[in-house]
A protein has these predicted regions:
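RNase H-like, metal-dependent nuclease domains and their acidic two-metal-ion catalytic environment used
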Residues: 1-99, 103-181
């Protein structure tokens, strides 16, 4: 059960300027499309973040040694990033980023300039639920399959937006393109 959409988001700071969502895309076209968009918007490769967990072989090779070499990997199940030298109490990087995204939304720090997908984005973000504390006391999110079951699709827009929190957590806010496949 893969993703429903290939989602690319172009950011200017914390403003979503452009969203491209493609229902089906050939794996060989993924890196080509990202690179075209990156060049069009003059975004350095280091400011491109991609979902490393969802990559197919061709795209993974491109990210490692091809036209996307130098882009930033996002690994959902990676260990949370230390903030101010302190270990964070999240199950994984994805949970850490979603909790930061929730705080930023509450504080009205994000703006979606792109109008085409607002309804889907809001619907998806409203479905992200925290799980009860586990035995280890870590903050965690419910599985994507539960969300897919409720709304009838994968929360691909929400996941792509969530990945934008990575540079915020790291303290390196420059980012241009986020893509979730």
């Amino acid at each position: 059960t893969g993703s429903d959409k290939f989602v690319l988001i172009v950011w200017a700071g914390l403003v979503i300027e452009k969203i491209i969502a493609i229902d089906k895309i050939d794996d060989t076209q993924v890196s080509k499309r990202i690179n075209e968009l990156r060049i069009e918007h003059r975004i350095p490769l280091k400011n491109v973040i991609y979902d490393a967990d969802g990559l197919q072989t061709f795209t993974r090779n491109s990210a490692n040694s091809g036209v996307l070499s130098g882009a930033t990997q996002f690994n959902n199940n990676a260990v949370p990033i230390k903030v101010n030298g302190k270990k964070e109490n999240y199950k994984n990087l994805k949970a850490q980023c979603y909790f930061m995204l929730a705080d930023m939304c509450k504080d009205n720090l994000l703006f979606i300039q792109e109008k085409n997908y607002r309804t889907q984005i809001i619907q998806e973000l409203e479905q992200i639920n925290r799980l009860a504390f586990s035995d280890d006391g870590k903050l965690a999110l419910e599985k994507k399959d539960a969300i897919r079951e409720r709304i009838g699709r994968s929360p691909d827009f929400a996941d792509a937006i969530m990945m934008r929190m990575l540079p915020e957590i790291k303290g390196t806010q420059k980012v241009g393109i986020i893509w979730n496949n």
